[in-house]
Amino acid sequence: MEAINLTILVIGVLFLISIVATLISSRIGAPILLVFLIIGMLAGEQGLGGITFNNPQVAFLIGSIALVIILFDGGMRTHPERFRVALAPAAMLATLGVVVTCTVTGLAAAWILGLHWLQGLLLGAILSSTDAAAVFSIFQSRGIRIKDRVASTLEIESGSNDPMAVMLTITLVGVLAEYTALDWSVLIVFLKQAIIGGAVGYGAGRLFVFLCRKLPLSFAFFPLMAVACCISVYAVTTQFEGSGFLAVYLMGYFVGNARLPQVLYILRVHDGLAWLSQIVMFLMLGLLVVPSQLLDHLLPALAIAGVLIFIARPLAVLLSLIPFHFPAKDQLFISWVGLRGAVPIILALFPWLAGVPDEHLYFNVAFVIVIVSLVFQGWSISPVARWLKLEVPKESGPDQTMPLDAIASNEVIEVVSFTLKGDSPMLDKQWQDFTVPHSAEFLGVIRDGEWLLSRDNPVFKLKDSVLVLCKMADVPDISTVLASAASSRTMTASDFFGDFVLNAQITLDELDAFYSITLPEHESHVTLADYITERFHRRVVVGDQVKLDALVLTVRQLDDHGNVKLVGIKPSDS
């Protein structure tokens, strides 16, 4: 009994330390996942805690479940617009990119470590997948907004490249364990995994949405049902030789983008579950490693990390994105943010579980490379994004959102609150002074703890909390009118887009009438929208910039079909 109590105490203390450590991580800018990993190592058998954990079966089980929850949460937060912009390039990175990374890294590893070329390719396959947990958490914890073309490509790639990496790893493990052959059947296996995973993910997502609409459950049970369903979907898909990770990611996508009142509740709970999964997974992997064994292959692992980061990944990105005409800056950033996290370490358990010779070599080398990736790539995401000018201002939003879950409405209804700061456009004005969607209802103001009713037409003052009842779909439009600029932003909208906003349907000669610019030949009657769209090969996102003589045109807003709607204009720096 004492041993059980001690185990519970240790688990609780490790969780508490990990949660508190996130504050330190945000202060020094360190990747949170790296902090969790280090805490696990410090608690391990050669660390301060002295905890011995060397069970790869348990590690694989816990890691797989944690990844399922993380991928489901990431899928729920993927907007349909991101698929429009990035599905095809992300799919190329998740297939051709993985193969190129595996080949280049594997051959380099074989030469550096003196391994057989098949063993080198196995190590390359283990390292070929970018990690969804790392990518999702880095973007969330950094609080930066990257151009959708780049962020969407990275997120969709990290959520969908596991099938190819898993397939290559399992195939090469089988070859080295002498129970399978390396031939063209590998391609058939991959296609089978992708097709089954995609079909099951689509069906499971639609079925879950149907059940949410039909089952009269308390809202508290829907997040639990989502966990049960995504774990079951992973297991069933894997049992039928499909990609369970891809199925779970797609299921999350269809659930997260369904118009259900339960979705907001599920998202809120799963945000905590995803963080819990990341803490558990990285603590466990930190406990599993033996730090002294990492030193045995430290220098070769660092050399392989250099090949992976500076040669294999950029080459994979360059070859994969040739058909899509990505700007050079976008490709450079995508190359740099090929983050490795828990997935390579978990894939490195496959040789260990299968009894492949030198099984600890794969695990230890993968572990070192993951640490290198998190330290150098994860730590530098923000400055690299700013250096390449890929960061865009965050979208305005309410300070608090309160969904009215229990109301049986066809559309999700929310009460949103905007706290007035010094730069708020609402100061010293009244509600009727603003143009907002007609469905929005002003509920009043909370001032010094007192509720001032809407019928009294209060004049808005500093630190007031303005309450608005509206449809969830109208929140972005309302926020554009009412929200203050966040004090934590690294840039303001006017700094990035310019002080003037133009309708994208005006023509270049109409623009010339105001600014007296030199126009390109034969394009004077072209609209701003067409001029910008043509230069980005019809894949435009908010933040795309085009220089026109002495002006910089920046895409500020797209319509529902992805067409340029509003353009910011400012003078060029040069």
Curated annotation (Swiss-Prot):
One Pfam family this sequence matches: CorC_HlyC
Activity across pH: Optimum pH is 7.5. Exhibits K(+)/H(+) antiporter activity between pH 7.5 and 9.5.
Lipid bilayer topology: Multi-pass membrane protein
Source species, domain of life: Bacteria
UniProt-listed InterPro entries: Cation/H_exchanger_TM, FAD-bd_PCMH-like_sf, FAD-bd_PCMH_sub2, Na+/solute_symporter_sf, RCK_C, RCK_C_sf, Transptr-assoc_dom
The keyword Transmembrane helix is annotated on this UniProt entry: yes
Principal cellular location given in the protein's record: membrane
PROSITE patterns per record: RCK_C
Molecular function terms from GO: antiporter activity; flavin adenine dinucleotide binding; monoatomic cation transmembrane transporter activity
GO BP of this protein: potassium ion transport; proton transmembrane transport
Transmembrane annotation, as ranges: 4-24, 28-48, 56-76, 85-105, 117-139, 170-190, 191-211, 216-236, 244-264, 272-292, 302-322, 332-352, 361-381
Keywords from the named record: Antiport, Cell inner membrane, Cell membrane, Ion transport, Membrane, Potassium, Potassium transport, Transmembrane, Transmembrane helix, Transport
UniProt subcellular location: Cell inner membrane
Domain annotation RCK C-terminal: ranges: 402-484
GO CC terms in record: plasma membrane
Family per record: Belongs to the monovalent cation:proton antiporter 1 (CPA1) transporter (TC 2.A.36) family.
Role description: K(+)/H(+) antiporter that extrudes potassium in exchange for external protons. Can also catalyze NH(4)(+)/H(+) antiport. Could have weak activity with Na(+).
Full protein name: K(+)/H(+) antiporter NhaP
Organism: Alkalimonas amylolytica
Gene coding for it: nhaP
